[in-house]
């Protein structure tokens, strides 16, 4: 993640002078800083995890996104923007030690990245501030993993990766410094599909399913070119 952010900063530093001098074509590049509250959503457990305490969990994580977009306002005077966005987020982790019937400790690790096609409606006015609403459809690339410790001390793990349909809806506002540069702040809700992993240990089935989602706050820039 640190390498990605450093590389992105270098690219933007090199590209900024050219972007600032470019004429408005409607195209823009938008790096975004993500503050994400990742939630496991509803947790479904098999009987092997009875009493383990495994339940809904949420955690604040950081991430980053990069979007390439087109603003229909400069050329067509339509208050629409469309963009393709890829976002990465940090891991969410939690441990339960409630001493269940079969397991004494469970550690969960979750992660998601997304690829969205987003559409925004801008409410243009006579000020540099432009409120907007938006929604997007795309794919979520989810990771789910669990480490189990049984009541007799043995350990085993299960994990998997999922590619799910994902969606988002949100609101935000931008402030334009000039025709080529704007700062953007927004909130969105992100649905990430359904994940389910299972394993057998000593003849007992251990299965966990969940519907993850994120509440995300984003701060970004838009470089028009």
Which residues does each predicted region cover?
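Transmembrane beta-barrel strands of outer-membrane/channel proteins
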Residues: 31-35, 82-88, 133-139, 173, ...
């Amino acid at each position: 993640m640190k390498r990605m952010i450093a590389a992105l900063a270098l690219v933007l530093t090199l590209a900024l002078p050219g972007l600032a001098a470019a004429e408005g074509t409607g195209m823009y590049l938008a790096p975004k800083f993500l503050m994400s509250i990742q939630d496991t959503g509803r947790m479904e457990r098999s009987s092997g995890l009875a009493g383990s305490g495994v339940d809904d969990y949420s955690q604040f994580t950081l991430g980053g996104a990069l979007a390439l977009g087109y603003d229909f306002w400069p050329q067509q005077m339509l208050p629409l923007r469309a963009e393709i966005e890829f976002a990465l987020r940090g891991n969410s982790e939690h441990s339960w030690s409630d001493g269940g019937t079969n397991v004494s400790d469970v550690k969960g690790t979750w992660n998601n990245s997304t690829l969205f096609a987003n559409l925004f409606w801008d409410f243009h006015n006579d000020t540099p501030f432009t409120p907007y609403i938006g929604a997007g459809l795309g794919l979520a690339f989810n990771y789910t993993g669990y480490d189990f410790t049984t009541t007799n001390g043995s350990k085993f793990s299960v994990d998997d990766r999922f590619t799910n349909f994902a969606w988002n809806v949100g609101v935000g506002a931008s402030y334009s410094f000039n025709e080529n540069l704007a700062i953007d702040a927004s909130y969105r809700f992100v649905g990430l599909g359904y994940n389910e992993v299972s394993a057998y240990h000593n003849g007992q089935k251990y299965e966990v399913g969940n519907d993850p989602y994120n509440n995300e706050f984003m701060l970004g820039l838009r470089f028009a070119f």
